[in-house]
């Protein structure tokens, strides 16, 4: 055995992986002494996804050597759905047998209930070298994750794109569709749903509603808040922190 990782909350890897399943065909999981990480571009080169589980935040983590595991997400899609919110997930990598396995069992441990084991061959996946993005952000805010998802769902009713404008004292979300249909929400500095607004001057850009919803629909179950960073007509960065790690998505803007 090369790696063993025990997640105390199975819902955390489940929802994070469900985002990856929606946005990526395949990727490489990297196991090191610091923990588990994944960094990949979506097929359209529009979104950069970065997921980390910290070794110190896992219930148990052992590693013989740094290990890379190629995963085709369609092969694990149905298994991931089987992880209950209160169940534990144990991930095991056996390099000698060239397999990785998921063990799903009750919160109280293997000894007290049914243990479900799913095993898969490790596949060779091309790991694209991704340089650090030289992106600076002129504006940022934090928002209740469920509120952001509700806003995106509202805008999705009328448009494929959402314009986000951050001013020193408020955040405006707006979508305009065919026939002049529009949806708009404004959250001011004293709103109970938005926090820590930071902007020297107004910054605005448009982004794909579908892509943002693919992320927010799952990650709202892991993080109460999401940090949003953007600049005028530049990429947006969403950062979700949760008990065992952090998920970051950087998404290119719409260019009119």
Swiss-Prot record:
InterPro entries cross-referenced by the UniProt entry: DNA_clamp_sf, Pr_cel_nuc_antig, Pr_cel_nuc_antig_C, Pr_cel_nuc_antig_N
Molecular function in Gene Ontology: DNA binding; DNA polymerase processivity factor activity
Pfam families (UniProt xref): PCNA_C, PCNA_N
Designated name of the protein: DNA polymerase sliding clamp 2
Keyword DNA-binding assigned: yes
Subunit and interaction comment: Homotrimer. The subunits circularize to form a toroid; DNA passes through its center. Replication factor C (RFC) is required to load the toroid on the DNA.
Gene3D superfamilies: 3.70.10.10
GO biological process: leading strand elongation; regulation of DNA replication
Species name: Pyrobaculum aerophilum (strain ATCC 51768 / DSM 7523 / JCM 9630 / CIP 104966 / NBRC 100827 / IM2)
Gene name of the encoded protein: pcn2
Origin organism lineage: Archaea, Thermoproteota, Thermoprotei, Thermoproteales, Thermoproteaceae
């Amino acid at each position: 055995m090369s790696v063993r990782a025990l997640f105390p909350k199975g819902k955390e890897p489940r929802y994070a992986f469900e985002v990856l399943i929606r946005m990526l065909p395949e990727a490489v999981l990297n196991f090191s002494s610091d923990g588990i990480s994944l960094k990949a571009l979506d097929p359209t080169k529009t979104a950069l996804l970065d997921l980390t589980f910290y070794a110190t935040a896992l219930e148990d983590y052992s590693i013989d050597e740094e290990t890379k595991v190629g995963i085709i997400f369609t092969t694990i899609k149905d298994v991931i759905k089987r992880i209950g919110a209160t169940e534990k997930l144990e991930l095991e990598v056996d390099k000698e047998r060239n397999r990785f396995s998921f063990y799903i069992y009750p919160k109280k441990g293997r000894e007290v209930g049914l243990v479900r084991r799913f095993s898969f061959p490790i596949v060779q996946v091309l790991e694209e070298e991704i340089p650090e993005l030289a992106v600076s952000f002129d504006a940022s805010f934090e928002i209740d994750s469920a509120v952001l998802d509700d806003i995106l769902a509202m805008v999705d009713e009328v448009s494929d794109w959402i314009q986000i404008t951050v001013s020193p004292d408020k955040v405006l979300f707006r979508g305009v569709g065919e026939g002049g249909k529009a949806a708009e929400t404004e959250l001011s500095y004293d709103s109970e749903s938005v926090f820590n607004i930071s902007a020297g001057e107004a910054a605005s850009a448009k982004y794909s509603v579908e892509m943002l919803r693919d992320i927010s629909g799952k990650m709202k179950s892991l993080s109460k808040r999401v940090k949003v960073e953007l600049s005028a007509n530049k990429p947006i960065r969403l950062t979700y922190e949760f008990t065992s790690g952090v998920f970051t998505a950087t998404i290119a803007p719409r260019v009119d």
